[in-house]
Amino acid sequence: MKKLIIVFVLLLSALSCFSQTEFTTCLFDTSRNRVIPLAVYQPHKVNLKTKVIIFSHGYDGNKNNKSNQTYAYLTRFLSQKGFYVISIQHELVDDPLLAMEGNFMETRMPNWERGVANILFTIQEFKKLKPQLNWNDLILIGHSNGGDMTMLFATRYPELINKAISMDHRRMIMPRIQKPLLYTLRGCDYDTDYGVLPTEKEQEQFRMKVVKLDGVTHSNMGENGTEEQHNLINQYIYGFLTWR
């Protein structure tokens, strides 16, 4: 009987580690006649101190209608750390494909602007749905093309967010501003376009952080990474989120 009680207690302890709630839902932006699918990772305890993270996935060729769920290693980890995570599905099957040539600051801008509109609408609606959350310290995170969207949002709506993190974005120039605090994790296999990343002097001036991860490629930051690589990414991102 004593052994059964111990096993039961251990099971409860294990379950408590995964006690956050995950669900999918959709918003509808009538002004753009657009559905915005979401994956939500809600921590066990939610109150006025609970910070919100808006996550934006990398480009997937409009082929995967669950791209926003392929970064669960990160979104679940952050939820377990007490953050309320909303992961946006930016690509719909009938969307125009992402430009693969030309000046990307011009040819990809319509895609990024659509992403910025998705993020802004999601923030506006969830402020109504979840007013009990901490919206004063809003955080954006994005990988690759989602990181480009994140940096464009930080450029256009800096007053709405506290921190923004890109995971190996390569095209959108990071704004040289002190608020929000900006952070980027760099893979080891691709360079960025000219001027995207701040110089060392600019990093110091604007309190921006650029961190290169040796042995972690661009695709490793998505679902193709190993558990060890994902754990490393998680720790770097969590470290920045708790940095003041």
What are these regions (language model features)?
Residues 183-185:
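Short beta-strand/loop motif that positions the catalytic acidic residue
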Residues 4-13:
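Sec-dependent N-terminal signal peptides
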Residues 176-181, 205-207:
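Short, proline-enriched alpha-helix->beta-strand connector loops that line the catalytic pocket
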Residues 121-177:
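Primarily recognizes the serine-hydrolase "nucleophile elbow" in alpha/beta-hydrolase
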Residues 179, 190-202:
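Short alpha-helix in the alpha/beta-hydrolase fold that links the catalytic acid
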Residues 33-129:
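Serine-hydrolase catalytic machinery in alpha/beta-hydrolase-like enzymes
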Residues 17-19:
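Boundary at the C-terminal end of the N-terminal hydrophobic targeting segment
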Residues 207-244:
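C-terminal catalytic histidine-bearing segment of alpha/beta-hydrolase fold enzymes
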